A protein has these predicted regions:
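Intrinsic-disorder/low-complexity accessory segments
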Residues: 1-151, 166
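An acidic, glycine-rich "communication" segment
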Residues: 28-29, 156, 160-180
Length: 180
């Protein structure tokens, strides 16, 4: 325990050693049917991927900042990696500000005429073309289905912000052209 305690002190993390009886009590509380929790015992550190475009955005991704600060290793993956079948090599996938509908995100209304936003649109169109798609929305639907298959295969998915809505909209719009 001493190595872990020293590491916590160095990082400014408060920790407490508990007895087996205390651990058992905590587990019993978690296993109550009216509690929305579960116990997950990690046998190994999960291999984490963060789905994010390769070009920098003006807003920060809080998750990559937190992972970097905590010194938790992760890889950044985007459409090329997903389309190449790399997702099953990861245990965990994180989605954040992505727009899986091909409508270029929630920032379109305010930032569509900004140079950095136009560059982002052009980059997405270029990636779609490179991967053989006529439209970004077609690429993003295929990416969404690959993410769905990753989860169905046992992968963990954590989505937040606009990724949650746009992921569902993308799947719901299958066979419907929702983009000009």
């Amino acid at each position: 325990h001493q190595v872990f305690e020293e590491e916590c002190v160095v990082r400014g993390v408060t920790s407490q050693v508990i007895t087996d009886v205390q651990a058992s009590s905590i587990k019993q509380q978690i296993l109550q049917p009216d509690v929305n929790m579960d116990i997950i015992e990690l046998q190994k550190a999960p291999r984490i991927a963060v789905y994010s475009p390769k070009n920098r955005q003006p807003w920060d991704d809080a998750v990559t900042l937190a992972l970097t600060y905590a010194e938790i290793p992760y890889d950044v993956v985007y459409d090329h990696e997903v389309m190449s079948g790399m997702l099953p090599t990861y245990d965990w996938l994180h989605l954040h500000h992505e727009d899986f509908t091909g409508q270029y995100g929630k920032f379109w209304a305010h930032y569509r005429n900004y140079p950095w936003y136009k560059e982002d649109v052009a980059a997405n169109e270029e990636i779609a073309s490179e991967l053989g798609f006529k439209k970004v929305s077609e690429l993003k639907l295929t990416v969404t289905k690959k993410i769905r298959d990753f989860v169905l295969g046992g992968g963990y998915l954590f989505a937040m912000c606009s990724a949650t809505d746009s992921y569902d909209v993308s799947l719901a719009a299958d066979n419907i052209d929702i983009c000009d």
